[in-house]
């Protein structure tokens, strides 16, 4: 029992003090570079929005529809910035405060074997990030899209779509990940 507690305490210390080895540093840098490129592209999109209908579209679109499309594009871009800042912050906080190590310690205690532990780890991380993005998804679907008249989704349809999506992810993604984990475990 004492050895079990020492092992748990040691694993717990590692969870909350992640080391930034070369690979982890490269991953964080790549993540930040990609986020900044996406952010820059969004800013360029916002900068290039024009309040007047271009001459080329006169007679094809009316001014009201054009202004609505520009307002929608602006709202989408602004929402995307807020959403991506939130996602990036949650991911980096989870990483730097040892969230991945904590989840690993949690699922390792369950005794599911290597493949089951790997699937449990990925499933819990997926669940956590889905839950953290859920408020943004709900706002996007039921507030932002509704404001511009694009939302045809009912709450019931939304829930059914979410269930279908997660079932497909679990079956297809889980099957592929299980196969990869099994191959890694089987190859000497």
Q: Model segments located where?
A:
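Hydrophobic or amphipathic, alpha-helical segments that drive membrane association/targeting
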Residues: 17-188
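Short, Lys/Arg-enriched N-terminal segments with co-localized hydrophobic residues
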Residues: 1-16
